[in-house]
Amino acid sequence: MYKRQALELANHKPEKCIIFQREKDKADLNPKIDITWEDAHKGAKPAECEKMNSNDYAYILYTSGTTGLPKGIVRDIGGHIVALKWTMKNIYNIEPDDVWWSASDIGWIVGHSYIVYAPLFYGCTTVLFEGKPVGTPDAGVFWRIISEHKVKSLFTAPTAIRAIKKEDPNGEFFKKYDLSKFDKLFLAGERADPDTIKWFEKLSNSPVIDHWWQTETSWAITSDCTGIESFPVKYGSAFKPVPGYDLKVLNSEGEEVGAGKMGDIVVKLPLPPGTFPTLWGADKRYKENYMTTYPGYYQTYDAGHIDEDGYVWIMSRTDDIINVAGHRLSTGAIEE
């Protein structure tokens, strides 16, 4: 049903759709455009690798359009490979013989970068999981997969851990499995509340790294670089800027604010390798959306502050800031 509606709304309709059928929940097919995966696979032959230039684009990934219409993020091949391969060791402390699991949808930036490209560029094993943290079949599915596949580190969204915590607050499922190979939990995609981080730390006796990045960047802007030097956790912060990113906090006049002061978080240009060089078919919009408000800086559209120790606190999107009697209050601060 949803596919039909999407195709009806699309300005550029696909000639064919490849459908992977589920035995327990088969989709109704349109014989004019739908092909099953099995039929498409029949007679398929290996294709030779295509030689590409480093500045050619690897893919187009559309954002949700938080700041207007959806934007087609493009990624240059050379910079993408260099950046992602660097992160596997230096941010995540993964070795080529380790097992890595990014529990995300493969169609999102986390899936692109850390289910497919980064681990495979680096040469380690990557886990691709189709399911949910709860209900497929229970709140222990993450721990079962980690145990069975000897996963060293897990990368997921805070919402996933909150869902598990709600279903299994005492960690009874966690206790059923051998998780001796498990080392760290990395969180991103939204702000991780301190209660959730502390709950998992206590349950697992493992570090929890809440780090921050965007579809536009394809890899972390801030993190604890566990393969270089680990810093103490500050609950509610996303650690410190990763090498390659020079972060500032600016007020509405474009002036840098002091430590602990709320403002717009920006990145001083140039951006490091692996970030988006433009928008698909929209070079002008790329500059107007991201590089114009604060000349010389990339506008992240996230608000927060940097404390006296250099830790970055992402509190909300800039359009979620509430002005009360001249005081800028973030949704993150209100939640706490």
Feature locations, PLM:
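Conserved S/T- and glycine-rich ATP-binding loop of Class I adenylate-forming
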Residues: 57, 63-66, 88, 100, ...
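Conserved AMP-binding/adenylation subdomain of ANL enzymes
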Residues: 81-99, 109-153, 166-172
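Conserved pre-ATP/AMP-binding loop-to-beta segment of ANL
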Residues: 15-19, 30-62, 69, 84, ...
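Structural core segment of the AMP-binding/adenylate-forming
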Residues: 3-39, 157-158
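Gly/Ser/Thr-rich phosphate-binding loop
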Residues: 124, 152-156, 165-232, 246
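AMP-binding/adenylate-forming catalytic core of the ANL superfamily
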Residues: 3, 147, 154, 271-272, ...
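Conserved ATP/PPi-binding loop(s) of AMP-dependent carboxylate-activating enzymes
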Residues: 240-244, 255-290, 329-331
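Active-site glycine-centered loops adjacent to acidic/histidine catalytic or metal-binding residues
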Residues: 105, 189, 213, 239, ...
